[in-house]
């Protein structure tokens, strides 16, 4: 069975990075790889902010990168593709007051992945690895919810099998852009930020691969964000549940939606470092590693807003919570943490763009309070099950920091709370010192 190899934006950021990707893929030729790539680092943001005056620089970057990697007819073909992409983006930017602004946005940003996949395929061929660019819109079929489309699994799996299986069986490496798909009518859509991981997982599930590899710029999943805790360590192995919790609550090396297709099809997911390909990274599978540690990692998420709804109507009433959550459902806003009392509900969310409309509806249910500038900290580990005293250690370690919205997941593998954003780095550093640095020293002393 084949494997899927997904390379993020930093892994295809420039000519040297793309050369490195070609070397990594070449070493896996015997495993029948399918390659998924993100747009070059920074390109998606640049396309989202594009104006007629700024887009020339975006496409010049692609051409300049190609000139370092290709020559002759290969370079000419890619240059034509870049020219066509720029022409199409300029036309899209000229649309005045589009009836579906998000659909236009999806079409514009899709060119980042289209160009990076074309360039990667061309470099692989030039380096002796037979490869072919495949338009991901022929494989990933979605609903019509632009900028955050949901895949239609039956159609996507069937199309992926039809498009990719003959290539894989013939020894050809398919190269696809992640993040993008199309409706049944062929209209371009995108899967939302981080969607390239999701693309890789969907393709892996469709082809029933042995392993999905996510190549990024860090060596696997770490015990904390290395930008906050420089001494954070790589975790050798995580269970699907642990990885899902960490991804959802801020460990950005893995998109949360990546896990579900892997779980449903019992596919291992390996997170690797494209700058250090010799390292094994982190393997995510059904079982966690056997470890003396109760806690595997500490994740955090900033930019969180807390919403509190207070109403005496909650007392002994049926249907209040349903009405409350339906408001968020209508606005397609995901809730992170929820706590309830007899007369109030507090919840956190990291997408506050629809908040004014949401608050207007919530005020029909009760008094609404808003707290911005908050952060979520999530302590994760299968060892939390049945281990007494973890919460006490956490709160003792950060006893001078105000904590709210304390929650333990139903799976009992995560413990989550909310604090002021200004103190999140301090809190994460202290907790890592308590549960990793100190515990490691104690284990060595035994």
What kind of region is each of these model predictions?
Residues 280-446:
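A conserved regulatory-domain signal marking ACT and ACT-like small-molecule sensing domains
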Residues 239-240, 244-285, 290-294, 298-310:
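A conserved active-site cap/scaffold subdomain adjacent to cofactor or substrate pockets
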Residues 39-41, 138, 218-220, 265-269, ...:
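Glycine-rich beta-alpha junction loops
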